[in-house]
């Protein structure tokens, strides 16, 4: 029999809210298809923890991970090569890229990155600022591993 991990146990606690905040919370539960208030609150806490974790910019912390989604005009001269050059010159580890042809003019690329937050964000800004790039969005993530 497996011994329960302390992270697996659920702790119940109460929160006091004004009625308008509770109404907004309940509206989001319905709108986003959550099964309970607890599920929504857990997601909101995780999102805030990722945001705070990324704000702590330690240059020696190479554990940040993110996905950069880029849509660009593949007819833009040398754009693809410039994007590759930026990735190679960056201090960020490019773990994986996926490239798809959306239509006759546009490509979508996902780039999975690992490194410190400032290097990852710098790479996103450099690629996003290239002529021919129509969209560049960075999605920040965390595994929520606890260092004990």
UniProtKB/Swiss-Prot annotation:
Cofactor note: Binds 1 nickel ion per subunit.
Residues that coordinate or bind Ni(2+): 88, 99, 101, 107
GO terms of molecular function: DNA binding; DNA-binding transcription factor activity; nickel cation binding
Pfam families in the record: NikR_C (PF08753), RHH_1 (PF01402)
Coiled-coil regions, chain positions: none
Cofactor(s) listed in the protein's UniProt record: Ni(2+)
InterPro entries noted in UniProt: Acetolactate_synth/TF_NikR_C, ACT-like_dom_sf, Arc_rbn_hlx_hlx, CopG, CopG/NikR_regulator, Ni_resp_reg_NikR, Ribbon_hlx_hlx, TF_NikR_Ni-bd_C
GO aspect biological process, one term: response to nickel cation
Protein's UniProt keywords contain Transcription: yes
Protein keywords: DNA-binding, Metal-binding, Nickel, Transcription, Transcription regulation
Domain of life: Bacteria
Family: Belongs to the transcriptional regulatory CopG/NikR family.
Entries under HAMAP family matching the protein: NikR (MF_00476)
Function of the protein: Transcriptional regulator.
Protein name from the UniProt record: Putative nickel-responsive regulator
